[in-house]
UniProtKB/Swiss-Prot annotation:
Residues binding (2R)-3-phosphoglycerate: V23, D24, F25, N26, Q38, R39, S62, H63, G65, R66, L122, R123, H170, R171
Catalyzed reaction equations: (2R)-3-phosphoglycerate + ATP = (2R)-3-phospho-glyceroyl phosphate + ADP; L-seryl-[protein] + ATP = O-phospho-L-seryl-[protein] + ADP + H(+)
Organism whose genome encodes this protein: Sus scrofa
Annotated PANTHER family: PHOSPHOGLYCERATE KINASE (PTHR11406), PHOSPHOGLYCERATE KINASE 1 (PTHR11406:SF14)
Modified residues (Phosphotyrosine): Y76, Y196
Swiss-Prot/TrEMBL GO biological process terms: gluconeogenesis; glycolytic process
UniProt protein name: Phosphoglycerate kinase 1
PTM-bearing positions, type N6-acetyllysine: K11, K48, K75, K86, K91, K97, K131, K146, K199, K267, K291, K361
Pathway, per record: Carbohydrate degradation; glycolysis; pyruvate from D-glyceraldehyde 3-phosphate: step 2/5
Length: 417
């Protein structure tokens, strides 16, 4: 799915117009301080373009966290983002304490030319996601008439709509699909993300390698299935490798992750790989632990030896890393989704770190390397490799759904050209 037939910001006339822009400011926070401003920085080019081209105002809307439709300003307010934003484009930012309603509509109706306005968290209203929780924690559904009113109020805040929230593009939420304005364009971040993935999936450089990690096979079945039609090689690592190894090699895996649901489809996936001529690399050795704990006792195991009862594999070992590095060395394009060990804990981070070093090395020799958001993007931040690979996606779930071959509702809703 690409943006080739969708309106993009560079083709949108913003002069004298109020631009209402959906951004992804869902940033990690600690004690009301922003710990990683990557997503805020990523939105600046679109904001700056509007201001440089004479937009009357830019009204920014975003969610933060999962307040589930209940206002929680102490925990999930976007106010700290307003402070951070001021320092980036060096412009004053007006922060409003709500995102819809008469007062917000009034503030956005005729602002001073060149204003930047940030609305409060969209998810303080249950109408944004269409569902949430009440004060007692029970699930509630939004009233359809109120959803319509919420969307109508958002639509009054601008003359044209820009969506630059790639990280939320897989969600059919009100701010993503319900703003009713004549022109709806994709912002620069949305464009960059979709162009990278479109090229990677529609006309890849070959050999094309997918590195797939993470825990559950069942969660990644669609991903593996779709990628087996596109790639030349695939590394299957992380926790889900144990389900493959138990089914295929009858390996003893101790208390390592085993995905009962996913195990039923392992043989089908392997025969599809064989039919498509895709070379699959699985780990051959492991760093083990006597419990799921940062300070667990550490051991070693191989596929042949098996993992003893009561122990679990939490990282791949040096022989696996060698096999992975050979696959990386053969590739001209790599898409990586999911770490190959519990990288958050030093004792089990070596496999993912060694693989990251190889991917960086491949990038420097001209290989196209795409990191698919989520945990793998966190690895890049941790080891400072964000600018040493071709592209780090800002959207975990959205990039996963693109790699699964799905249509993203937030992109689908943009104006056609």
């Amino acid at each position: 799915m690409s943006l080739s037939n969708k309106l993009t910001l560079d083709k949108l006339d913003v002069k004298g117009k109020r631009v209402v822009m959906r951004v992804d400011f869902n940033v990690p926070m600690k004690n009301n301080q922003i710990t990683n401003n990557q997503r805020i920085k990523a939105a600046i080019p679109s904001i700056k373009f509007c201001l440089d081209n004479g937009a009357k105002s830019v009204v920014l809307m975003s969610h933060l966290g999962r307040p589930d439709g209940i206002p929680m300003p102490d925990k999930y307010s976007l106010e700290p983002v307003a402070v951070e934003l001021k320092s980036l484009p060096g412009k004053d930012v007006l922060f409003l304490k709500d995102c819809v309603g008469p007062e917000v509509e009034k503030a956005c109706a005729d602002p001073a030319a060149g204003s930047v306005i940030l609305l409060e968290n969209l998810r303080f209203h249950v109408e944004e996601e269409g569902k949430g929780k009440d004060a007692s924690g029970s699930k509630v559904k939004a009233d359809p008439a109120k959803i319509e009113a919420f969307r109508a109020s958002l639509s009054k805040l601008g003359d044209v709509y820009v969506n630059d929230a790639f990280g939320t593009a897989h969600r059919a939420h009100s701010s993503m699909v319900g703003v009713n304005l004549p022109k709806k364009a994709g912002g620069f971040l949305m464009k960059k993300e979709l162009n990278y993935f479109a090229k990677a999936l529609e006309s890849p450089e070959r050999p094309f390698l997918a590195i797939l990690g993470g825990a559950k096979v069942a969660d990644k079945i669609q991903l593996i299935n779709n990628m087996l039609d596109k790639v030349n090689e695939m590394i299957i690592g992380g926790g889900m490798a144990f389900t493959f190894l138990k089914v295929l090699n009858n390996m003893e895996i101790g208390t390592s992750l085993f995905d009962e649901e996913g195990s039923k489809i392992v043989k089908d996936l392997m025969s599809k790989a064989e039919k498509n001529g895709v070379k699959i690399t699985l780990p051959v050795d492991f760093v083990t632990a006597d419990k799921f704990d940062e300070n667990a006792k550490i051991g070693q195991a191989t596929v042949a030896s098996g993992i003893p009862a009561g122990w679990m594999g939490l990282d791949c070992g040096p022989e696996s890393s060698k096999k992975y590095s050979e696959a990386v060395a053969r590739a001209k394009q790599i898409v990586w989704n999911g770490p190959v060990g519990v990288f958050e804990w030093e004792a089990f981070a070596q496999g993912t770190k060694a693989l990251m070093d190889e991917v960086v090395k491949a990038t420097s020799r001209g290989c196209i390397t795409i990191i698919g958001g989520g945990d793998t993007a966190t690895c890049c931040a941790k080891w400072n490799t964000e600018d040493k690979v071709s592209h780090v996606s800002t959207g975990g779930g959205a990039s996963l759904e693109l790699l699964e071959g799905k249509v993203l509702p937030g992109v689908d809703a943009l104006s056609n050209v």
